[in-house]
């Protein structure tokens, strides 16, 4: 645990008592503060009270008497679509609002790190898609190379749950837009922006607000080095804003296009990763044989991870060795098994159209299981990527809407995962891939995308 200093003797309100909220309360108490907690969920409050934390509704102004700050969990909206009443009240009273990510970065100014000759290096990864794989891959490569590394944030442990670590250690953080938009301190040594596509737009008031939340990672003090995916206009803009000259090597551009210019570029094209600096190739990796990184989208993730690891001084061969032993993450292009020549792939994390499109590009002869709770924008952007789909099997609340969105693709409304898997198996032929890539949220039928993926795996197991 990282004790949160700077609030000793003060009362700090904590809103939301899930994994990050409870860890925040513990870290505040360890630093000498008195947490005052609240969660609308009775069971969450009971868990906090069992650890000795006081819980009280933060509904009225007098509840904030003597409160120095409010720390909120990332899933609680503070602006769009409607501000949470407790957060709005705190803001109206002039009480600072922060989250655990902001507290983590503020902790570097406290005595807990004084014994180290060098503070931990922090790599923070954000973007619409590929954050988890990129973060986990960076962590895996660094660990395999013998670097003391911890993985936290939106993946792995809560950021305040990690240990201060070893002298010169590394912390890899996956950060969602929910986490970056409110943190009062964001000072990573290396910041990674994988890509941008429409997602969570209701939470951010539109695409501009969504990009602004991601961009904050690069504007508060600025990282020592930025790794920027430049295949979208927003990435190009961000790289341009951060560069002071064409050859500025503080910015590493990651692209699927042919490398050009005098800067530091890492490209992933047709299964090959190449590094160029000052117009010369300085490293390359054949990504095609690596089973844990299937498809062009994972090759882009690998390029981002490569750039981050090179920033820390790893040699290309060290990175290649780490890539080769990477097993991939559950629910992200996860090969579940093969039966009668049919391959089953679980990409339940493909919760938006862009990530589903990338999954569809990674495989041939697809029997596609899709649907759930449809997000803004519809399926029009998927149309160019449906050529390899033999048939779609549609599930969830938005199954009928999905059917209307893909009129030229053979499809069947199955509603449930069990029916979809059974129908796909009955019609599959050797060489087909049965792919779960929902292009939708899971909350109509499941608690989260993990449960949806686990249900797919359980249904597939009946046929293996």
From Swiss-Prot:
Reactions the enzyme catalyzes: UDP-N-acetyl-alpha-D-muramoyl-L-alanine + D-glutamate + ATP = UDP-N-acetyl-alpha-D-muramoyl-L-alanyl-D-glutamate + ADP + phosphate + H(+)
Cellular compartments annotated: Cytoplasm
Main localization category: cytoplasm
Keywords: ATP-binding, Cell cycle, Cell division, Cell shape, Cell wall biogenesis/degradation, Cytoplasm, Ligase, Nucleotide-binding, Peptidoglycan synthesis
Cell wall biogenesis/degradation listed as a keyword: yes
Binding site for ATP: 127-133
Annotated GO biological process: cell division; cell wall organization; peptidoglycan biosynthetic process; regulation of cell shape
Pathway: Cell wall biogenesis; peptidoglycan biosynthesis
GO MF terms held by the record: ATP binding; UDP-N-acetylmuramoylalanine-D-glutamate ligase activity
Matches recorded under Pfam families: Mur_ligase_C, Mur_ligase_M
CC annotations in GO: cytoplasm
EC number: 6.3.2.9
Function: Cell wall formation. Catalyzes the addition of glutamate to the nucleotide precursor UDP-N-acetylmuramoyl-L-alanine (UMA).
Family: Belongs to the MurCDEF family.
Protein name: UDP-N-acetylmuramoylalanine--D-glutamate ligase
Taxonomic source organism: Dinoroseobacter shibae (strain DSM 16493 / NCIMB 14021 / DFL 12)
């Amino acid at each position: 645990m990282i004790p949160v200093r700077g609030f000793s003797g003060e009362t700090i309100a904590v809103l939301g008592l899930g994994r990050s909220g409870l860890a925040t309360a513990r870290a505040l108490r360890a630093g000498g503060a008195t947490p005052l907690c609240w969660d609308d969920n009775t069971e969450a409050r009971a868990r906090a009270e069992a650890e000795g934390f006081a819980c009280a509704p933060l509904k009225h102004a007098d509840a904030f008497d003597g409160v120095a700050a409010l720390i909120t969990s990332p899933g609680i909206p503070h602006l769009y679509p409607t501000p949470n009443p407790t957060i709005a009240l705190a803001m109206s009273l002039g009480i600072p609002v922060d989250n655990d990510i902001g507290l983590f970065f503020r902790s570097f100014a406290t005595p807990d790190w004084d014994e180290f000759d060098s503070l931990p290096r922090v790599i923070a990864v954000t973007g619409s898609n590929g954050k988890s794989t990129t973060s986990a891959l960076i962590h895996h490569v660094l660990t395999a190379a013998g670097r003391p590394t911890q993985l936290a944030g939106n993946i792995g442990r809560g950021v305040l749950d990690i240990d201060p670590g070893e002298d010169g250690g590394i912390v890899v953080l996956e950060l969602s837009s929910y986490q970056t938009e409110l943190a009062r301190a964001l000072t990573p040594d290396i910041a990674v922006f994988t890509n941008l596509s429409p997602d969570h737009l209701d939470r951010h008031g539109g695409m501009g607000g969504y990009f602004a939340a991601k961009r904050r990672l690069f504007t508060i003090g600025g990282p020592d080095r930025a790794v920027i995916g430049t295949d979208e206009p927003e990435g190009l803009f961000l790289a341009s804003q951060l560069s002071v000259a064409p050859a500025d090597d503080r910015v590493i551009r990651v692209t699927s296009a042919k490398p050009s210019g005098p800067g530091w570029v890492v490209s992933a094209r047709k299964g090959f990763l190449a590094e160029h600096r000052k117009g010369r190739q300085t490293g390359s990796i054949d990504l095609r044989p690596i089973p844990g990184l299937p498809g062009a989208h994972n090759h882009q993730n690998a390029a981002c991870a490569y750039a981050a690891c090179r920033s820390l001084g790893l040699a290309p061969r060290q990175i290649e060795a780490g890539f080769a032993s990477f097993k991939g993450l559950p629910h992200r292009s996860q090969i579940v098994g093969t039966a009668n020549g049919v391959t089953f792939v679980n990409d339940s994390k493909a919760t938006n159209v862009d990530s589903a499109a990338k999954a569809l590009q990674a495989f041939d002869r697809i029997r596609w299981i899709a649907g759930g709770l449809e997000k803004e924008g519809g399926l029009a952007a998927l149309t160019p990527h449906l050529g390899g789909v033999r048939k779609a099997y549609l599930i969830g609340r938005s199954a009928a809407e999905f059917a209307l969105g893909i009129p030229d693709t053979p499809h069947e409304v199955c509603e449930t995962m069990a029916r979809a898997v059974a129908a796909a198996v009955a019609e599959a032929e050797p060489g087909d891939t049965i792919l779960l890539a929902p292009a939708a949220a899971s909350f109509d039928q499941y608690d989260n995308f993990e449960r949806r993926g686990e249900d797919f795996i359980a249904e597939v197991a009946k046929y293996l």
